[in-house]
Design a protein with these regions (language model features):
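Structural microenvironment flanking redox-active thiols in thiol-disulfide oxidoreductases
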Residues: 183-221, 231-238
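Conserved redox-active cysteine motifs that mediate thiol-disulfide chemistry
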Residues: 166, 174-191
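A short beta-strand-turn-helix
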Residues: 151-170, 196
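Bacterial N-terminal signal peptides that target proteins for export
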Residues: 1-10
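Thiol/disulfide oxidoreductase modules built on the thioredoxin-like
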Residues: 216-224, 229-276
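Alpha-helical, heptad-rich or low-complexity scaffold/stalk segments
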Residues: 27-112
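N-proximal helix/coil linker or "cap" segments that precede and/or mark the start of modular domains
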Residues: 106-149, 163-166
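Short pre-active-site segment immediately N-terminal to redox-active cysteine/selenocysteine motifs
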Residues: 168-170, 174-178, 210, 243, ...
Length: 279
């Protein structure tokens, strides 16, 4: 969820906020200032990022209802999960989003709010048909992911199958070399792999790019967890990957126990792994 990196047809868009940008209204000065801040937050270090998104959340919440607030909350809703914003900030964003949707239903924004509710565990008081449909779609996606198996090769040619990893805790991470939030979380994945591999953690990082693109990227950065290639996007489709990064944790019994629809910090990954009994 998120300012995730989305891929449509043959064109790469490095932000799911772009659909809102295409219909962005002319902003008054206050809204222009908020819009400018949104354009800067991806470049901030984590500690500054957390403070900035908390401040922006309160500013957006206080805006009067109208097209400007609708556009800004749409953009912000797709950025605020790109790190550890904290539950209070996420709750403010969700409440502002629900207020906007009461006035002006929007299928895309309802989908964003549903993902906030499901995967960031915020409380949402909204009962529009579109929001209920978005939650139902997430339920269907999760059922499909739980039933999914796959076999893919890593960069050395070794094949990995999900069903053969029972007894291990498996963290599947969908990513790409061109995706900034994906690149930002990779050092944390490496640290987790080194720390918990002896305890049975397997990390499978899956890219839809060709091996000729992925291999030099990984070699240069010296990541050692398994990196798999899915250039036909078959496994991406099985997991309903509409934006990256996305991460899924399966426990030792093969049950899907945690999901993330955007970039996670090391602390957030640790919380996901605890749900599979790894700590």
């Amino acid at each position: 969820m998120t300012s995730r990196c989305l891929r449509f047809a043959a064109v790469v868009f490095v932000s799911s906020a772009l659909p809102y940008a295409q219909t962005r209204p002319d902003f008054p000065d206050q809204e222009k200032a908020i819009s400018a801040e949104l354009g800067k937050i991806r470049s901030l270090p984590d500690a500054e990022w957390t403070k900035a998104v908390a401040q922006i959340a309160r500013q957006v919440q206080q805006l009067p209802q109208g097209p400007g607030k609708h556009s800004l909350i749409g953009r912000f809703g797709n950025l605020v999960t790109e790190g550890d914003a904290g539950h209070e900030t996420l709750q403010i964003v969700a409440a502002a989003m629900a207020d906007v949707l009461q006035e002006s239903p929007d299928p895309q924004l309802e989908g964003t709010l549903a993902r906030l509710a499901r995967y960031e565990h915020v409380d949402v008081s909204l009962h529009t048909p579109g929001y209920r449909e978005a939650l139902a779609k997430l339920d269907a996606n999760d059922r499909q992911r739980q039933q999914t198996d796959f076999t893919l090769s890593d960069l050395s040619g070794r094949q990995w199958s999900l069903k053969t990893l029972r007894g291990k805790v498996v963290l599947i991470n969908f990513w790409a070399t061109w995706c900034p939030p994906c690149r930002k979380e990779m050092p944390d994945l490496q640290a987790l792999y080194e720390r918990f591999r002896p305890k049975g953690l397997v990390i499978l990082a899956i890219s839809d790019e060709e091996i000729a693109t992925v291999q030099p990227f990984i070699r240069e950065r010296k990541y050692t967890y398994p990196v798999l290639v899915d250039p036909g996007r078959k496994v991406h489709r099985l997991f309903v990957v509409e934006g990256i990064p996305m991460s899924f944790v399966f426990n030792r019994e093969g049950r899907l126990v945690a999901e993330a629809m955007d970039r996670r910090t090391e602390t957030q990954f640790l919380a996901m792994l605890r749900q599979a009994g790894v700590e």
